[in-house]
UniProtKB/Swiss-Prot annotation:
This is Ribosome-recycling factor. GO terms for molecular function: ribosomal large subunit binding. It comes from Listeria monocytogenes serovar 1/2a (strain ATCC BAA-679 / EGD-e). GO terms for biological process: translation; translational termination. Keywords: Cytoplasm, Protein biosynthesis.
Amino acid sequence: MSKEVLSKSKEKMEKAEQALTRQLGTIRAGRANASLLDRLSVDYYGAATPVNQMASISVPEARMLLITPYDKTILGEIEKAILKSDLGLTPNNDGSVLRLSIPQLTEERRKELVKEVKKEAEEAKVAVRNIRREANEELKKLEKNGDITEDDLRSYGEDVQKLTDESIKNIDSITKDKEAEILEV
């Protein structure tokens, strides 16, 4: 039972790390990356549809995204969605594809992005700490019910703390890598 608590906690912590990685992937770091458009949705026949489900997104050059819609009639809608988004990019529509040139980031914008990265990382750390708290509460319930001894409680508590420390170390590493990518000129 207590091993289940540990494995569930580890799984949840890994999911928090993966969520952070996905979230940071959508932050523009000066290089073209198809995941920049992951959060972008377009109104398609009355339903909000992600751009990556209605178009092929490729990276022909280091600072360019090429969006080729499967249905050419939706090209204008995708263009409007990009202009309305907080990406700060201006699409170039040539009738069949959209080209997104990704400009160099200014020093000021880089600092804003680093702040955003740190905020996302802190949210991930809070999630991991909440998972630790939940695991410790479950272990205390098990001890109270007589399923594990007090010594087991302490031992499993230490294991949960090790998982937490490892997860936070991974989050710090992910964050550091993203910050380096953003600050790279």
